[in-house]
Regions:
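Extended amphipathic alpha-helical scaffolds
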Residues: 2-56, 241-377, 562-576, 584, ...
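Alpha/propeptide regions of enzymes that mature by internal proteolysis
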Residues: 3-14, 20-23, 37, 48, ...
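Conserved phosphate/anionic-ligand binding catalytic regions in large, soluble enzymes, centered on
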Residues: 38-41, 133-151, 338-361, 442-462, ...
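Conserved helix-loop functional segments at active or binding sites
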Residues: 106-114, 149, 365-368, 390-395, ...
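Flexible, glycine/charged-enriched surface loops at secondary-structure junctions
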Residues: 114-120, 155-157, 224-242, 273-274, ...
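Mobile "lid/hinge" segments at catalytic clefts and subdomain interfaces of large enzymes
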Residues: 151-267, 457-555
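Single-stranded RNA-binding regions, centering on S1/OB-family and related RNA-binding modules
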Residues: 560-562, 571-716
Length: 716
């Protein structure tokens, strides 16, 4: 009996296409990952990303948050490479993968129902990469489409676009070559009406240019929205019903009625610890008064606290009152200090209210650059910023752990903010690492890290183009659509507010933006308002606090930092400097005590704890690559005597012949009558033959020296 094989059919396969920034965008459904709630294969140019969304059928018990996980998987086969790990498998997500996961998470999370407690997984797998077509944008679009057509409750869709600035013109989804020269890299995610996410790095771009880029991206995003809405109409599934999170509104109403005045008094302080102590004392009173009537009240207390505090904070902010008594455009008390730690290369302490960040800068040779093995074009990083957030910074007793996604995201934001002002390697040939230790946190620690990094870099003598400061802007909206924005949000305002709009930059313009939302998006009016007030605030921070602390980078690097010398040689001479099996360069390193890095273009960076070792290594390399020039004078040592002349060493391993007739002015019978081994003499290069042999003349050299002395010219 023969085996029966039937060709597999895909009756639910659909393909949707559109043009996106001059390149084809395709969304394919119904062929891959059929068991997921929804799956979309996104094609953008030659980039391919499979986006799958899955939801648990029942809510998770005992939680008061939405359990959403977003993973952006970078497969090395997508760029035709085998992973460099020991077992040649992809390991944990890299920094860029984590940051991309966060970029996807932030715009989609606020659009899920507030009381949805089912686990939801978003998995974006990069399967092929065309560097002209961003996998990040493809993953955002695919995630939006998959959630929109799935049966998972979600209030999308969203659309995403990158905008660059090339030669003063805005460019949608710039290709690889355009990105290299672009002064702007902003990702804008929109719904049909509002902007829900902004992530930007920029080369000191003015507010009006940034606003125009966001505005145009939002308008362009509507084309994607229309395509995804078409998919929903044609193949979308009905959203499933879910059990709404339980909440005791009766108890909540009693507590707010009985304890409103006491709650306001508890909230009205600029001290985070005092606020928490007052609130905890008030919760004990709730227990005494209501526990008998509501024996299970503990399961609602966290949600009651959140809603109660938000009610107060929202009302106050709309009235122009803040929990610590500040005005909406008032920044908390600031302080800046440099040179905080001994022996480190540079340090800065930035304090804003109860938020304190200690940033420390370390300089090293270029061999310390971070090597990157990813699907992205960048292969190494010279400037690195790392952010640490220990438990004690918020008064929590918890052990130290490796950095999580939040720490990596905050560190990357501060890194992006300072990168445009970091000097080029030709001007400052050091690898640079800044570590920001959050020692106390009451909101805006990422912006504190930006200010602290600037202080540490300047204290370390890094010649940054301009100082950078960061500030955050919050938002509260009323039910009628009216809103108020406020500057420098602290922890409780961040927790209960609707927006954390972080902007970093110099006086000239913006270097980084990150926007987090808890609502359904921002109008253009709110975005413009946020850009305007953050500009004024960061200029005040620079002028009134940071620049009075340290007006410009120190003239020299720390005495504890490695000394650096940069030189350039003919690339053809690199093999001579390295030697067979590295023998020559290893000898130079051993004799001089210096570190040596050689680039393919012939640039050599020499580093050592002291300048003497650098100069010693430089002289060794100069001697190796030395090439005599016809007509030049050299002062060399006699190393060999022959019957026909003397060999003079011009540099180690490089000598030339002075014929007996070119030694003295008078006729001599023997070479020994004019010189002996070890004598030093001036010689002039008269010829270099086709075999590279160098002919010298002592006689011509002395005549030229005499003429220069008579004319008062220096002898080189």
């Amino acid at each position: 009996m023969s085996t029966i094989i039937t060709k597999r059919q895909f009756p639910h396969y659909h393909k949707y296409t559109m043009d996106l920034a001059g390149r084809p965008l395709t969304l394919e459904v119904g062929k891959l990952a059929e068991l997921a709630n929804a799956a979309v294969m996104v094609g953008y140019g030659d980039t391919r990303v499979l986006c799958c969304v899955t939801a648990a059928p029942r809510p998770r018990d005992g939680i008061d948050f939405f359990p959403l996980s977003v993973d952006f998987e970078e497969k090395m086969y997508a760029v035709g490479r085998i992973p460099g790990s020991f077992n040649r498998r992809e390991g944990r997500p890299g920094e860029k993968g984590i940051l991309t996961s966060r970029v996807i998470d932030r715009p989609i999370r606020p659009l899920f129902p507030y009381d949805f407690r089912n686990d939801v997984s978003v998995m974006c797998t990069v399967m092929a990469v065309d560097h002209d077509c961003s996998p990040e944008i493809a993953a955002l679009i695919g995630t939006s489409a998959a959630l929109a057509i799935s049966d998972i409750p979600w209030n999308g869709p969203v659309a995403a676009l990158k905008v660059g600035l090339v030669d003063g013109k805005l460019v949608f989804n710039p290709d690889a070559e355009q990105r290299k020269v672009s002064d702007l890299d902003v990702t804008v995610v929109s719904t049909g009406k509002k902007v829900v996410m902004i992530e930007a790095g920029a080369n000191e771009v003015p507010n009006d240019v940034m606003f125009e880029a966001i505005k145009q991206a939002h308008e362009e995003n509507q084309k994607q929205i229309a395509l995804i809405n078409q998919m929903v109409q044609e193949i979308g599934k009905p959203k499933f019903e879910y059990p709404h999170a339980d909440f005791n509104y009766e108890l909540f109403n009693k507590i707010t009625a009985d304890f409103m005045d006491e709650a306001k008094a508890a909230m009205d302080t600029d001290d985070k610890n005092v606020r928490e102590q007052r609130w905890n004392a008030m919760i004990e009173k709730w227990h005494e008064k209501y526990l008998e009537e509501y024996p299970n009240m503990d399961q609602y207390l966290e949600e009651i606290t959140y809603k109660f505090q938000k009610m107060i904070v929202k009302k106050w902010l709309l009235e122009g009152h803040r929990v610590d008594g500040r005005q909406k455009n008032e920044i908390r008390p600031l302080d800046a200090e440099v040179g905080v730690l001994p022996r480190v290369h540079g340090s800065g302490l930035f304090t804003r209210g109860q938020t304190q960040v200690l940033s420390v800068c370390t300089l090293d040779t270029l061999s310390a650059n971070q090597k990157l093995d990813t699907i992205w074009e960048e292969t190494e990083k010279r400037y690195m910023h790392h952010y640490n957030f220990p438990g004690y910074s918020v008064g929590e007793a918890k052990p130290a752990r490796s950095p999580g996604r939040r720490e990596i995201g905050h560190g990357a934001l501060a890194e992006r903010a300072l990168l445009p002002v970091i000097p080029p390697v030709e001007e400052f040939p050091y690898a640079i690492r800044v570590v920001s230790e959050v020692v106390s946190s009451n909101g805006s620690t990422s912006q504190g890290s930006i200010c602290g990094s600037t202080l540490a870099l300047m204290d370390a003598g890094v010649p940054i183009k301009a100082p950078v400061a960061g500030i955050s802007c919050g938002l509260i909206q009323d039910d009628d659509g009216s809103f108020t924005t406020f500057i420098d949000i602290q922890g409780v305002e961040d927790f209960h507010g609707e927006m954390d709009f972080k902007v970093a930059g110099t006086k000239k313009g913006i270097t980084a933006i990150q926007m987090d939302l808890k609502n359904d998006g921002l109008t253009m009016e709110i975005i413009k308002n946020a850009l305007d007030i953050t500009y004024d605030a960061r200029c005040q921070i620079l002028d009134q606090v940071m620049l009075p602390c340290i007006a410009e980078p120190r003239a020299e690097v720390s005495k504890y930092a490695p000394k650096m010398v940069t030189m350039h040689i003919d690339p053809d001479k690199i093999r001579d400097v390295i030697g067979k099996g590295g023998s020559v360069i290893q000898k130079i390193v051993a004799e001089s005590g210096a570190k040596i890095d050689i680039d393919d273009d012939g640039t050599i960076h020499i580093a050592s704890p002291d300048a003497e070792s650098c100069e010693k290594a430089k002289k060794c390399i100069d001697d190796i690559v030395f090439v005599p020039e016809v007509g030049q004078l050299y002062y060399g040592r006699v190393v060999r005597l022959m019957t026909f002349g003397a060999f003079v060493e011009l540099a180690p391993g490089k000598d030339g012949l002075v014929h007996i007739s070119k030694l003295p002015d008078k006729r001599i019978e023997k070479v020994e009558d004019a010189c002996k081994i070890g004598d030093m003499m001036w010689v002039k290069v008269t010829e270099i033959d086709e075999k590279g042999r160098v002919n010298l003349s002592h006689k011509d050299a002395m005549k030229e020296i005499a003429a220069k002395e008579a004319a008062g010219e220096p002898i080189k």
